[in-house]
């Protein structure tokens, strides 16, 4: 995903044993944004009876730092996940690795989730 020229948001569907059931493409955006609504992100989880989800999207710029929009989306996803009783395990932003960055940002690792 880090080499793609447009933002793409995907959701990994996880079963009760924390095994990956499938990966669904939810949104394709422009060069600098991917518009996604929680209902579109959780629709595949409901359809396939997923226990949990991992949300992943890329930043074509290569900078994996989350934007304000990314933070806002993560908060809304956490609220929706709680309401739907589907675990949101992580929201990961993919960029390009560098000397100062591993090339990704994990909201879970950062303590946001």
Predicted regions span which residues?
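Long amphipathic N-terminal alpha/beta scaffold segment
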Residues: 1-21
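Active-site-proximal loop/helix of nucleotide/amide-processing enzymes and allied scaffolds
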Residues: 13, 17, 27-113
């Amino acid at each position: 995903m880090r080499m793609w020229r447009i933002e793409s948001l995907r959701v990994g569907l996880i079963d009760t044993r924390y095994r990956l059931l499938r990966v669904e493409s939810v949104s394709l955006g422009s060069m600098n944004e991917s518009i996604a609504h929680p209902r579109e992100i959780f629709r595949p989880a409901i359809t396939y009876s997923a226990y949990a989800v991992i949300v992943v999207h890329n930043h074509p710029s290569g900078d994996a730092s989350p934007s304000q929009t990314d933070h806002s989306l993560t908060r809304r996803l956490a609220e929706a996940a709680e309401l739907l009783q589907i675990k949101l395990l992580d929201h990961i932003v993919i960029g390009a690795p560098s000397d100062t960055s591993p090339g990704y940002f994990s909201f879970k690792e950062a303590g946001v989730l």
